[in-house]
Amino acid sequence: MSDILEKILATKRAEVAAGLARVPLAEMRARAEAAAPARDFVGALRAKRDAGRPAVIAEIKKASPSKGVIRADFRPAEIAASYEKGGAACLSILTDAEYFQGSADYLKAARAACTLPVLRKDFMIDAYQVYEARAMGADCILLIVAALELPAMQALEALANELGMAVLVESHDAAELDAALTLRTPLQGINNRNLRTFEVSLDTTLSLLPKIGPERIVVTESGILAPADVDTMRSRGVNTFLVGEAFMRAADPGAELARLFA
């Protein structure tokens, strides 16, 4: 495991402990169970694909460890509405504060400003975070194979499903993908960014494609910056994209989405 990932996970363990001290598990579970029903994340992606359109999970991200602040003028509700107008299928919203300058409040504001299903993009390691995700309004969570042992990953998926949420499982290499494919979720994310080096290569998705059956939805993540990148993926049958930085650097994120996926 990379130094940056290990550092992030240590922060997450501390955050879970602090969260439990602030809001006990039973209370967080009650909040999750009382939340408004989840929106259909997988259904929204399939609807775009069935219509012959690329399904875009548009990301709302202020900063990252590798790039620093990406968007200084950061208004999550306006960005969410812009993405919906631009044709996004779903949203991905960073809630990690320490490394990505994210917030649960950003997720709540963005979800309230549109009708799109929302992914809580964070480093999930504990059941507490899954209850927390549903309580804040998330419709889907991210599970990163590099960050989790298989039994823990399977348990977190089961809990998310029990609460009505979808799961996007993320892998980066063949060994991680083998673990990811043991989960029930159809959403198989392939991160083109190596979390150990932060280098990006679209070949990561293309090389792993043959291992994934047609019943799954392959989500290519990171490095989609130009229409040629989209064309490369679609020509190989990849029609679901998670894109953040290319949109966040544009004056009008939704217009950039519409342009990139025209």
From Swiss-Prot:
Pathway: Amino-acid biosynthesis; L-tryptophan biosynthesis; L-tryptophan from chorismate: step 4/5. The gene is trpC. GO terms for biological process: L-tryptophan biosynthetic process. Keywords: Amino-acid biosynthesis, Aromatic amino acid biosynthesis, Decarboxylase, Lyase, Tryptophan biosynthesis. InterPro entries: Aldolase_TIM, Indole-3-glycerol_P_synth, Indole-3-glycerol_P_synth_dom, Indole-3-GlycerolPSynthase_CS, RibuloseP-bd_barrel. Belongs to the TrpC family. This is Indole-3-glycerol phosphate synthase. The keyword S-adenosyl-L-methionine does not apply. It is an enzyme of class 4 (lyase). One of its GO terms (molecular function) is phosphoribosylanthranilate isomerase activity. It catalyses: 1-(2-carboxyphenylamino)-1-deoxy-D-ribulose 5-phosphate + H(+) = (1S,2R)-1-C-(indol-3-yl)glycerol 3-phosphate + CO2 + H2O. The keyword ATP-binding does not apply. Signal peptide: none annotated. Its EC number is 4.1.1.48. It comes from the Bacteria. HAMAP family: IGPS_B (MF_00134_B).
